[in-house]
């Protein structure tokens, strides 16, 4: 039965059933009622604006049409009929006549609850109508006779009356908080079990029980529970779930299966498991069971001919036992059914021919806990864990002692090394003093030898002078100032002693005098040369002129030899002197000017030989020049004089052990810290992140000493060579390599420094995966879109390839490749038109797919690896804290444990959510990562929006063409064409509204409705297993499905 009438039926009723047209009210009331009608239509603004332009006559017609399209029966109609069935004052004959329609009324009610809008359902359940109470009471009334028949009325009237009394108390409990007079009257009639009315009530109940009223009542409750609002009412009702559970006593296996399916679905809702167990506790009390679930097992064994009931029963047992998270309680429930003989019965039934039942039985057996095996494994594991813990503790103590001994040894070795260096320096000073003293002694010895030789020459000269004086050649005369003057005498003297020999003698005398401390002996005057000798002897040389020989002083000692050339001057034969330009030390590094230089031998004769660039440098402001042209990433300004001396020392004295490029890069890195080597090493040892920036530590990680470098540095130390002779980078590397557990410490510092950044980076990515997975999986509109695509695809392919039941999501990309005959439209464009015309509620389906674009950019595998690495880093920090007392690390561990635990939980949740949604769409999580899965939806949404936009443009073009044609026709015909066109638009709009009103389809309710049906459908297709229980429970209790009152 439908709730609204078809268009054809409307026209028929308009002529035959509907009364005459009601007179039009006054304009004010008309506008108010018209506004209410417009609001109920939920029209777009442009169409609502068009309707407001109607005249009053058309507005009144629209109001009348709308008011005729109302739900056929209001809720109170069904409630009055159900109350009539419960009225104890009704005669037997009248009740028999009424009850003939009870099943039909209940079926109509079920259809109305399932298909009408939520407002109708809320009205049925409100405090005024109390429809849920009436349904539960009628269900209890219908089952009263079933209970009596079950116990056996043949046992005697007293026994049956006692059971009636017990059952009536159950009915009375349904409304212990107060109910209407009619219900109290019916309840009192049942309590009077000895009276005629009590017997009549039981007979009426038996009459009802022979029909399908119990089954349809359960269907009505199921329809109510499919709405969030109704589900809340049923769960909070004191006896609704109890009465549903008691319906298992119905003789119809179909009804039992329906009840068990509904109860199984409730079990998977958070808090529902406790309610179901409470209902079966009540079942045990009412039905006088010795053990809970006793009747259920009895029905399970006896209804072996009805497979659907057995499947539903096995499914319910599996869920009620294995859907709890508390393992102890789960084992308790499992044992509860074992005592009732479930294990033996399943052993007999597991070879059943029914595939559905076999699957459910196997699912239960897969979930069963083998407590004995678990206990044995647990004991073995505990022993192993205790041994491991003991060994780890022992190893920890030994390692700690070893580290202490190593630290003490290293301290002693360091002290000894310092003493050794000090002694080496003292030895160097002694050697230098010894070498200086040896040089002085050697110089003194040479001077003594030279003096001895000079005195010997002096004696020889004196002898020669005495000989000459005795020969009469010269005469020695002492002058007043103490000098000795030599005077040449007669010609005879010249014959034996030439003038050159005399000069040499005087020079020798001068030298001796100089060495001995006496004055030089000048030659005051030389007599004219004697007359030439007789021919035999050789003629003497020509005597000097009188002016030349007046006085011949003794020349001074010869000058010392010339020193080597100056370092600033090059003497070149045939070339002028060239100054060697000294290197200029700048405060900052400057860029290179890539010119082509002349060689020194090319300078001579050029303009460059005439210019002085040093003078220009003295005139320029070089500091400003350096500020303008210095390269980036410069260190602090260094004193120029100090830098000159350091550079010269480095060039001359420093020893380099590292590779040149590596040493250069290390120097650049160290300058960034602006700290000494000792400060850096101390900060690393104390995990001081305030002293060392994280980026500097990360750069320093690239310079961890290699094995070859450590070998070189150790060799240098073994040779006991002084550290101050090492280059600054080599010295840093030497101290750096001495830090205990250097790699581990650097890793911890890097981990601690980057922890917050990593958490802040990973958390949004995990949130994107979780949100996108949940939205894609729970989107009913997307599901409907895929349904449309599957339908059209099967329609196109069925004749050639046959129909299929699903398709890979990658197929969505092919919608644009499938084109129409005229090649103007693709299959996606057509789907967009279909959605707009037939399923307008699906037009914004992409609004339900949240964060798919962000999730598409996430590499879940890398994120999970990063989270795992964070866990390893935290373990490293904890291990370090357990071995050594580091306040910094302890404080970090205390503040960061919560963040890391939350991040790990988020990562697990993201992985599970993604795996679920991928499996839900028929893909494999192993081959379909988020970077492949979510981009499919991103591309599809983008293509769909473009298709919608292109359709709108095409439609506008067609409308423009049509208006152009109409304008051309208007010129040829009556000028009233525009008015006719406007009326035509209004008629189309009215027709569309009527089509929407007459359209019989279930509306898509917002958010959280429809979940119970989804659960039941999923359970029918996929058996419940314990490993999916937790995921399933979260899925069914997602915030997008239920509110906190449900979950």
Curated annotation (Swiss-Prot):
* Membrane-spanning segments: none
This entry carries the following GO cellular component terms, namely: cytosol; plasma membrane
User: Which Gene3D superfamilies does this entry report, sorted A to Z?
Assistant: Formin, FH2 domain (1.20.58.2220), Leucine-rich Repeat Variant (1.25.10.10)
Q: Which family does it belong to?
A: Belongs to the formin homology family.
List the protein's name.
Formin-like protein 3
Q: Which InterPro entries match?
A: ARM-like (IPR011989), ARM-type_fold (IPR016024), DAD_dom (IPR014767), FH2_Formin (IPR015425), FH2_Formin_sf (IPR042201), FH3_dom (IPR010472), FMNL_animal (IPR043592), GBD/FH3_dom (IPR014768)
Cytoplasm listed as a keyword: yes
Q: Where is the FH2 domain?
A: 580-970
Q: Where is this region: Disordered?
A: 520-561
> Where in the sequence does UniProt note compositional bias of the Pro residues kind?
527-546
- UniProt subcellular location: Cytoplasm; Cell membrane
**Domain spans labelled GBD/FH3:** 22-462
What if the gene is knocked out?
Morpholino knockdown of the protein causes profound defects in angiogenesis. Although sprouting of the intersomitic vessels occurs, the endothelial cells fail to extend fully across the intersomic region and there is no apparent formation of the dorsal longitudinal anastomosing vessel. No other obvious defect is observed in the developing morphant.
Q: What keywords sit in the KW lines?
A: Actin-binding, Angiogenesis, Cell membrane, Cytoplasm, Developmental protein, Lipoprotein, Membrane, Myristate
Q: Which gene encodes it?
A: fmnl3
**Which organism does this sequence originate in?**
Danio rerio
Q: Which Pfam families match?
A: Drf_FH3, Drf_GBD, FH2
Q: What does this protein do?
A: Required for developmental angiogenesis, but not for vasculogenesis.
User: Which domain of life does the protein's organism represent?
Assistant: Eukaryota
Gene Ontology biological-process entries: actin filament polymerization; angiogenesis; cell migration; cortical actin cytoskeleton organization; filopodium assembly; regulation of cell shape; sprouting angiogenesis
Topological relation to the membrane, as annotated:
Lipid-anchor
On whether RNA-binding is a keyword of this UniProt record, the answer is no
Lipid-conjugated positions (N-myristoyl glycine): 2
| Gene Ontology molecular-function annotations | actin filament binding; small GTPase binding
**Segments forming domain DAD:** 1000-1037
């Amino acid at each position: 039965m439908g709730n609204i009438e078809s268009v054809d039926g409307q026209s028929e009723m308009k002529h035959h059933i509907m009364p005459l047209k009601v007179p039009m009210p006054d304009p004010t009331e008309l506008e108010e009622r018209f506004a209410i009608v417009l609001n109920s239509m939920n029209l777009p603004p442009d169409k609502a604006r068009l309707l407001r332009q109607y005249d009053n006559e058309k507005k009144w017609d629209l109001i009348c049409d709308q008011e005729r399209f109302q739900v056929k029966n209001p809720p109170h109609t069904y409630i009055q009929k159900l109350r009539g069935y419960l009225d104890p004052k009704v005669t037997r004959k009248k009740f028999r006549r009424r009850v003939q329609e009870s099943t039909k009324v209940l079926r109509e009610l079920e259809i109305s609850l399932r298909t009408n809008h939520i407002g109708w359902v809320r009205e049925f359940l409100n405090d005024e109508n109390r429809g849920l109470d009436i349904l539960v009471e009628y269900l209890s009334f219908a089952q009263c006779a079933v209970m009596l028949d079950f116990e056996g009325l043949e046992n005697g009237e007293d026994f049956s009356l006692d059971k009636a009394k017990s059952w009536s108390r159950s009915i009375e409990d349904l409304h212990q908080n107060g109910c209407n007079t009619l219900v109290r009257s019916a309840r009192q009639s049942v309590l009077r079990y000895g009276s005629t009315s009590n017997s009549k009530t039981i007979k009426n109940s038996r009459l009802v029980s022979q029909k399908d009223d119990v089954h349809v009542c359960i269907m009505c409750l199921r329809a109510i529970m499919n709405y969030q609002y109704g589900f809340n009412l049923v769960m909070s009702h004191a006896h609704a779930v109890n009465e549903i559970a008691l319906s298992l006593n119905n003789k119809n296996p179909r009804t039992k299966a329906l009840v068990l399916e509904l109860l199984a679905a409730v079990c998977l809702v958070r808090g529902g498991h406790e309610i179901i167990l409470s209902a079966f506790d009540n079942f045990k009390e009412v039905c006088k069971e010795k053990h809970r679930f006793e009747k259920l097992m009895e029905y399970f064994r006896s209804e072996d001919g009805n497979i659907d009931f057995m499947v539903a029963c096995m499914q319910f047992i599996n869920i009620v036992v294995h859907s709890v998270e508390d393992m102890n309680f789960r084992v308790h429930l499992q044992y509860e059914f074992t005592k009732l003989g479930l294990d033996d019965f399943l052993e007999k039934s597991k070879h059943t021919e029914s595939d559905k039942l076999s699957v459910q039985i196997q699912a239960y057996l897969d979930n069963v806990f083998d407590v004995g095996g678990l206990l044995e494994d647990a004991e073995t594991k505990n022993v192993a864990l205790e041994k491991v813990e003991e060994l780890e503790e022992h190893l920890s103590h030994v390692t700690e002692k070893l580290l202490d001994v190593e630290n003490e040894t290293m301290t002693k070795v360091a002290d000894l090394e310092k003493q050794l260096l000090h002694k080496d320096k003292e030895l160097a000073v002694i050697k230098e003093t010894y070498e200086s003293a040896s040089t002085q002694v050697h110089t003194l010895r040479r001077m003594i030898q030279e003096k001895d030789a000079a005195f010997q020459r002096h004696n020889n000269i004196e002898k020669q002078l005495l000989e000459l004086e005795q020969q009469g050649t010269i005469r020695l005369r002492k002058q007043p100032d103490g000098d000795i003057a030599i005077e040449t005498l007669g010609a005879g003297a010249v014959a034996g002693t030439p003038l050159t020999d005399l000069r040499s003698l005087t020079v020798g005398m001068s030298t001796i005098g100089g060495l001995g401390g006496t004055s030089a002996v000048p030659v005051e005057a030389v007599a004219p040369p004697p007359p030439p000798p007789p021919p035999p002897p050789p003629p003497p040389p020509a005597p000097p002129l009188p002016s030349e020989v007046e006085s011949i002083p003794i020349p001074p000692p010869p000058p010392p030899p010339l020193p080597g050339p100056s370092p600033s001057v090059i003497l070149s034969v045939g070339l002028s002197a060239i100054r060697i330009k000294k290197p200029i030390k700048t405060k900052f590094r400057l860029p290179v000017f890539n010119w082509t230089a002349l060689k020194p031998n090319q300078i001579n004769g050029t303009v460059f030989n005439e210019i002085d660039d040093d003078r220009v440098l003295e005139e320029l402001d070089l500091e400003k020049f350096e500020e303008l042209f210095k390269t980036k990433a410069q260190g602090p300004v260094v004193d120029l004089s100090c830098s000159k001396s350091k550079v010269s020392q480095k060039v001359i004295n420093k020893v380099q052990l590292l590779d040149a490029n590596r040493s250069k890069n290390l120097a650049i890195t160290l300058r960034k810290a602006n700290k000494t080597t000792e400060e850096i090493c101390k900060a690393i040892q104390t995990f001081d992140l305030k002293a060392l920036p994280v980026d500097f530590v990360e750069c320093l990680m690239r310079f961890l000493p290699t094995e070859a470098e450590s070998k070189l540095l150790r060799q240098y130390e073994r040779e006991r060579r002084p550290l101050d002779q090492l280059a600054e980078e080599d010295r840093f590397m030497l101290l750096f390599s001495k830090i205990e557990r250097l790699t581990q410490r650097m890793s911890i510092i890097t981990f601690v420094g980057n922890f917050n950044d990593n958490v802040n980076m990973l958390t949004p990515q995990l949130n994107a995966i979780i949100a996108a997975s949940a939205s894609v999986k729970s989107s009913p509109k997307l599901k409907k879109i895929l349904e449309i695509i599957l339908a059209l695809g099967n329609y196109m392919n069925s004749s050639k390839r046959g129909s299929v039941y699903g398709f890979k999501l990658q197929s969505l990309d092919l919608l644009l490749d499938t084109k129409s005959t005229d090649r103007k439209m693709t299959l996606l464009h057509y789907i967009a038109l279909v959605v707009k015309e037939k399923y307008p509620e699906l037009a914004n389906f992409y609004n339900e797919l949240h964060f798919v674009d962000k999730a598409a950019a996430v590499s879940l595998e890398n994120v999970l690896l990063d989270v795992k690495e964070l866990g390893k880093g935290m373990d490293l920090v904890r291990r370090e804290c357990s071995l050594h007392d580091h306040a910094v690390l302890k404080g970090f561990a205390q503040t960061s444990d919560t963040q890391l635990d939350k991040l790990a939980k988020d990562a697990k949740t993201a992985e599970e959510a993604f795996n679920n949604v991928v499996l839900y769409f028929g893909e494999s999580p192993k081959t379909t990562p988020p970077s492949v899965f979510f981009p499919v939806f991103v591309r599809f949404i983008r293509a769909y929006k473009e298709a919608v936009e292109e359709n709108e443009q095409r439609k506008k073009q067609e409308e423009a063409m049509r208006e152009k044609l109409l304008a051309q026709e208007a010129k040829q015909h009556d000028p009233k064409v525009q008015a006719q066109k406007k009326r035509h638009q209004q008629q189309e709009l009215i027709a569309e509204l009527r089509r929407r009103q007459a359209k019989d389809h279930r509306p898509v309710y917002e958010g959280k409705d429809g979940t119970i049906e989804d659960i039941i459908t999923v359970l029918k297709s996929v058996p419940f297993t314990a490993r999916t229980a937790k995921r399933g429970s979260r899925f069914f209790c997602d915030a997008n499905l239920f509110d906190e009152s449900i979950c």
